[in-house]
From Swiss-Prot:
Its EC number is 4.3.1.3. GO terms for molecular function: histidine ammonia-lyase activity. It catalyses: L-histidine = trans-urocanate + NH4(+). One of its GO terms (cellular component) is cytoplasm. This is Histidine ammonia-lyase.
Amino acid sequence: MSEHFILQPGQLSLVSIKQILDEELSCVLAEHAFELIRASHQTVKKVIDEKKTVYGINTGFGSLANQTISSDCLKELQRNIVLSHACGTGKLLPDSVVALILLLKINNLSQGYSGVRLELINALIALFNHKVYPCIPSKGSVGASGDLVPLAHLSLPLLGEGEVRHQGQVISAEEGLKLAGLKPLELEAKEGLALLNGLQVSTALALSALFISETLFETAIISGSLSVDAASGSDVPFDDRIHQIRGHQAQISAASMYRNLLAGSQIRESHRHCNRVQDPYSLRCQPQIMGAVLHQMQFVGQTLQVEANAISDNPLVFAEQGDILSGGNFHGEIIAMAADNLALALSEIGGSAERRIALLIDKNFSGLPAFLVRESGLNSGFMIAHVTAASCASDNKALAHPHSVDSLPTSANQEDHVSMATSAARRLHEMIDNTSTILAIELLAACQGLEFHKPLKTSPQLDKIYQSVRSVVKEYDKDRYFAPDIEKIKKKILDKEFSLLTLTNE
């Protein structure tokens, strides 16, 4: 068993979430949560004992909320909601995302507002700790009432239904439960609804995208700096005085990153007093562009940290007052809007990088050989690699269309406005693939551009990146099979090898 962390319900930070997932820590629930969970469950039991009618406990669901269910059918009701709602489709979510969904659901239920038993939460913890991941199709949620469909698939294995994945292999839920030391559960009142109501899938998809996007942000700062040197660009636009008087802290921070990366470049010193007055915007305005990107990522991070600890169940149990209240915390509008903002940021990262690639291959702008290859004509060089980048950038622009402005009524118009948070977050992963492709091509193009400046060198910091690229992709002295080179650099990007923190610590 891996090392464990003690989960303090409602106190997850983005840093702790990353650590838990990266280090594959197992989960132990803080003991002080036990009484909160017990009191919440007792409140639900009291409703049943007193024969009160409360939504989600002894009624139907959605537009069937006005139908009262008899006491002897309550367990069947909870089983039925899981089975009937498990109707997702599409590719299965990756294990890393499912692990995060489990963690968020455990964190949600453990705060004592859902009325479930500790036994149910412990079963989820066992799945998480033994890396038994329910098979969750990626499509089917509209982000209100929560992520009903994918969370139903998350819950199926607890009943002994459906399939799970363990060590990359799809196996039956029955086998998975044995691996986790569990037997199928019989759900009690409200437990099925509590499992299904919530925004943990939308939040997990958005969080996992944010974590990778932070890596792409750093890579784009590095690749953009390399492009400045390869194109004989100026570092004057990164002067701190320019950015201080605009006042945006994220822009000020971004400009500092460019200054630090370019400091000490022999290439820059060789043309410091040349006649070129101003660079194209894709070089000159990088702090303004990437500062705006950083600002959006910071906003998204703040939003998702709150949501990671938020109670998005319905109805909600307030055990201290003995109240069970119906509300709308399951509506994912804030997640959808955060995901839309992150989509804009990803599109701008890729779009500005594509423009720099176009600049580098154009001899009239960069002063480098056409398409970054000698004997152009005989060789096409980076001509079509740029086309691939353009294709990905264009794809991102379509994917960046806001999902939060969309809504389709469901459940016979009872759920008449929905957030589309899940699809808003899910499409980010396709944008990440596109953006990492574009950045890989820019890194290759910029490093190729540096070849034509030899014996002059780029800065010591950027030379580390150049050497890292050249460790897996040699210089293009003539045309060759290009696609594998892009994939090699994409892997380095996604493995976080092009990190500003790594450069700083070396």
